[in-house]
Amino acid sequence: MVLESVARIVKVQLPAYLKRLPVPESITGFARLTVSEWLRLLPFLGVLALLGYLAVRPFLPKKKQQKDSLINLKIQKENPKVVNEINIEDLCLTKAAYCRCWRSKTFPACDGSHNKHNELTGDNVGPLILKKKEV
């Protein structure tokens, strides 16, 4: 029953549909088509576009995946949450920079590793800078 229906569609209905399509003889004939003729061509052109896309899709470039999706790749991974506490009174320097990219070799202090991270990932992270207020 099902195969008979499929055979009827492929052998009878599809050829009849294609014969009724207003396909012009030349490229310039497309300019002379009426709106109703274009509307009759629309489903056929849509199916052709879909088949063309599905045929070309395997050859299209893949979306570029970010090199590393995790932020913290190596610092204190044994802890469920990394917290660094710094007493403000202990800031003897006039200015201190702290890492926010998790790439610093001297974590929590910033060593400029974010520059390489930004270059690789297209990110724009920078350090947290604390400085004493000048009186």
From Swiss-Prot:
Q: Implicated in which disease? A: Wolfram syndrome 2: A rare disorder characterized by juvenile-onset insulin-dependent diabetes mellitus with optic atrophy. Other manifestations include diabetes insipidus, sensorineural deafness, dementia, psychiatric illnesses. WFS2 patients additionally show a strong bleeding tendency and gastrointestinal ulceration. Diabetes insipidus may be absent.
Q: What is this protein called?
A: CDGSH iron-sulfur domain-containing protein 2
Residues crossing the lipid bilayer are 38-60
Cofactor(s) needed for function: [2Fe-2S] cluster
| Gene assigned in the entry | CISD2
Task: Note the subunit structure.
Answer: Homodimer. Interacts with BCL2; the interaction is direct and disrupted by BIK interaction with BCL2. Interacts with BCL2L1. Interacts with ITPR1.
Kindly give the membrane topology term recorded for this protein. Answer: Single-pass membrane protein
| Record-linked SMART domains | ZnF_CDGSH
Q: Ranges in the Cytoplasmic compartment?
A: 61-135
- Tell me the GO molecular function terms: 2 iron, 2 sulfur cluster binding; metal ion binding; protein homodimerization activity; RNA binding
Report the cofactor remark: Binds 1 [2Fe-2S] cluster.
